[in-house]
A protein has these predicted regions:
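Short, cationic low-complexity segments
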Residues: 173-182
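Acyl-donor binding region in acyl/amide transferases
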Residues: 1-163, 169
Length: 182
């Protein structure tokens, strides 16, 4: 996966951040056609945080219940109509289970960031994701608020019917080291 992303993805490999799940999809001939890397959610994202409706304390306690799609790549030889949205929909249906098996806790919401100057987000729309707003053109390394990066559309997909209940549940005294489940 690393070499495929390094060679064919416009952002390169970069390596996953924190907890992560990687999906490599093969065609009927056994060739890799799609690469997906899911990782830890963005620490702060105003459109996502408003959509969820959580407080800063709830975000701190429950951010581990959100997965970020860090890379999504359809390889050049995998150009098949509707392949990207089909694979994306199937991958998100199994993401919570894969995360639970690997890390012992679920994820209830998926997020991704799409550069608006490069992509329209059609694949996400076709896979039932919701665009909830745009970033401000800053990055997590921008502590001084001077770094300019491309503005991105924020796309979200609930992975569980009760995702808001899981993310917004009242904090418990014992929750400092963990997160509730639905």
């Amino acid at each position: 996966m690393r070499s495929l992303l390094a060679r064919y993805h416009y952002l390169g490999y970069g390596g996953p951040v924190g907890e992560n799940v990687q999906h490599l999809v093969h065609d009927a001939r056994g060739r890799a056609v799609v690469v997906m890397v899911w990782g830890a959610a963005a620490w702060k994202c105003a459109p996502r945080d408003a959509f969820v409706g959580w407080s800063p304390a709830q975000r701190r306690a429950r951010l581990s219940l959100v997965a970020n799609q860090q890379r999504f790549l359809v390889l050049p030889w995998g150009r098949v109509p509707h392949l990207a949205s089909h694979v994306l929909a199937r991958a998100t249906r199994r993401l919570a289970r894969d995360w639970q098996e690997r890390y012992g806790h679920p994820v209830v919401l998926a997020e991704t960031f799409v550069e608006v100057e490069r992509f329209a987000g059609t694949v996400y729309r076709a896979a039932n994701w919701t665009c909830v707003g745009r970033t401000q053109g800053r990055s997590r390394q921008d502590r001084a608020r001077t770094l300019q990066v491309p503005v991105k559309a924020v796309w979200l997909l609930p992975l569980h019917v009760r995702f808001r209940a899981a993310l917004n549940a009242p904090l418990t005294a014992s929750e400092e080291g963990g997160a509730p489940c639905c």
